[in-house]
Amino acid sequence: QKGNNFWYEYKTSNGKAWYVVDPVAKTKRSLFDLDDIAAQITEIVKDPFTAQQLPIQKLEAGEDGRTFTFQITSSQEVKKDSTDKDKGPKKEIFFFSYDYPTRKLTWLQDKKKETEYPDWASFSPDGKKLLFIAQVKTVKSTADKHPDLPKATGIIVTDLMYKHWDEWVTTAPHPFVADFDGNGISNIVDILEGEPYESPMKPWGGIEQLAWNTTSDKVAYTCRKKTGLEYAISTNSDIYIYDLNTKKTENITEENKGYDTNPQYSPDGKYIAWQSMERDGYEADLNRLFIMNLETGEKRFVSKAFESNVDAFVWGADAKVIYFTGVWHGESQIYALDLTNDSVKAITSGMYDYEGVALFGDKLIAKRHSMSMGDEIYSVALDGSTTQLTQENKQIYDQLEMGKVEGRWMKTTDGKQMLTWVIYPPQFDPNKKYPTLLFCEGGPQSPVSQFWSYRWNFQIMAANDYIIVAPNRRGLPGFGVEWNEQISGDYGGQCMKDYFTAIDEMAKEPYVDKDRLGCVGASFGGFSVYWLAGHHDKRFKAFIAHDGIFNMEMQYLETEEKWFANWDMGGAYWEKQNPVAQRTFANSPHLFVEKWDTPILCIHGEKDYRILANQAMAAFDAAVMRGVPAELLIYPDENHWVLKPQNGVLWQRTFFEWLDKWVKKAPSK
């Protein structure tokens, strides 16, 4: 949201569209004349783009509400570095600014200094400068070391973090500041000149990890100033403030040893806020909100009253309140944090998740979704009343009947209460018996909230005549710190008992066919599936594991973010005197393969460097060698997620073919 309007992107199978909305006048206009801008881009990029195939990415609005920046990836190939192991050619990227009222497009290039592959951008409040991100080479290629071997493809590795998420690491994103005169950029300065560090931090950090101050002469940025092994075992990032005039940098969070991320200056310029985790190496630590008085340096932990993570946040116009989203009891709501007394009050309620929040006069703008509806944009008044501003998928929803979603509180084996979501088929008949699926969440510290997924979509499962049981088992945020932290070092413990509680309680219902139960999950949920396959005592008729851990010892060494393995597994498997680590590795699913007796489908992406695909291959091989019916779906070009549309369709078809064969069509006693 900028100025008096907000903009949004709308994706369909036919391409993308971009709209500008005035919520007061209740008008919606296309941001681009698609035919015109396609012609302009084609002329500059020398690629024949059409209005339906505009590869516009990373669109950002300027403070004036009329100027936008974005990037275009052309089909033109550029020379690849020999350390670049991504399959396929490398494409040239172009960076543009666009004036919305005049429809003028400008190719942003500094004629004095070339900066390769500019990325996310942010205009300064005075509109005279541009902050953007560009990749800087940090790893010498084989060709650099051996120029006489230009065709050599081998990579020489000398330290950790050589892979991250889904890429071989050869560059680091750096923040750059440039003068902007409306026609182009000049006087580019690399804030991290000569430093091998990342800002924003990979793999998902974007422009939200950097911020302009109100006077346009300072930039706050997030950075973990570590490389190699030190990077791999630490989450200790900090907030730095760079002065454009003096070129000096100040670390304002040096005393904190965990994550410090996402700075935001207050509208009056007197304070800066950021998100902070306390402990080094613990990526699922409580995400707290801090503010600092820029004059006195006084820092304050202001979100103590909210015993869950502070997610997206935005300052109120008077700098006396901060609005934020956070998960509590399986829902992500918008809250108001009163900075006069640090009290927290919920603004929204209901079975929804609000995601992202922006201030818009005396209202807030946010995305909202649920298990029954994908993202739409809402206006939220401070009294909690809401107005839906977009109806992009109404014509589809009007043709569908969604299944009922309800929350049930269940007593766990240790006497606590656990929220479990139950999703019923459309036209549910309590007099019938339904095949039922236990859903195992990933993370492991990710909430089973009112999320909407194109892959793990509960309404699609329900429409295929399954009941879905989705427990908020131990190790999820939104139920207090103790509940969230219990899972670390106890992967085969209470969380697994919680799974059994959820499915056993539901199996008591007359409409749940206890002879036709399935179990599915991804990531930690995939680990859960592999573990349950050796412990379920014939509860389930079939399993599906996506990107799951099968062998914990191999996972400890294979995963790239070692801080996660150290914290959640409790240490290395060779630490024989470490009882927590030894308990973790004693619960590795591969140790219980002799008990596998139930059909299992294993799914994995070969570009998944968080959990390598050989985990699924090993699980599949073990099942086949045990004589257990098994199937393996491997994606050579997908990471920890399935992102390509037709791969997603293949996933759904394979998923339901397996369940229908082994669960739905299983004999019912």
Give residue spans per PLM region:
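Beta-propeller folds
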Residues: 1-345, 362-363, 371-373, 379-383, ...
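N-terminal cap/lid segment of alpha/beta-hydrolase-fold proteins
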Residues: 176-178, 391-431
